């Protein structure tokens, strides 16, 4: 178990080194893919996903929202549009809840929205940090601070 964790940590460090160093599309695409995976895992953990194998409408709306959010993040530098993506996702999730009322519970909709706000939006700040002035230096504070939090005391 230790060697598996060590090896995966080394591989992830190499990937982080490459993506953080190059930035731009080399950072945006892996973050988008990781965000999609993280969104799916969070929706499963929070019982938003009704089936382990298939996606429900709330998850599809979330996947489209994650993709729209990252497309907006990459192709524009307007933070107002990013906020509009978040609001649009919320409105779409609520519309789905109302349109298919007995099918979904309110807790599932809240879990879908929270999963979007927690994983994809949080991860996008690595890209935003990297793309700002002196971001090539500042972005390294993110994994360093995470390492500090996970080390045993």
List the predicted regions and their residue ranges:
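Conserved small/polar residues in nucleotide/adenosyl-binding loops
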Residues: 147-153
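Membrane-embedded alpha-helical bundles of polytopic integral membrane proteins
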Residues: 2-146
């Amino acid at each position: 178990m230790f060697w598996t964790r060590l090896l995966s940590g080394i591989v992830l460090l190499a990937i982080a080194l490459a993506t953080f160093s190059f930035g731009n599309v080399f950072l945006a695409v892996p973050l988008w893919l990781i965000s999609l995976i993280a969104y799916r895992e969070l929706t499963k953990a929070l019982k938003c996903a009704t089936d382990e194998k298939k996606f429900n409408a709330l998850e599809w709306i979330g996947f489209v929202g994650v993709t729209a959010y990252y497309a907006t993040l990459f192709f524009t530098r307007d933070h107002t549009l990013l906020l509009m993506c978040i609001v649009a996702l919320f409105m779409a999730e609520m519309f789905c809840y109302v349109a298919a009322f007995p099918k979904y519970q309110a807790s599932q909709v809240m879990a879908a929205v929270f999963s979007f706000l927690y994983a994809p939006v949080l991860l996008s700040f690595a890209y935003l940090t990297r793309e700002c002035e002196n971001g090539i230096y500042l972005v390294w504070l993110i994994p360093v601070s995470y390492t500090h939090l996970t080390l045993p005391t």
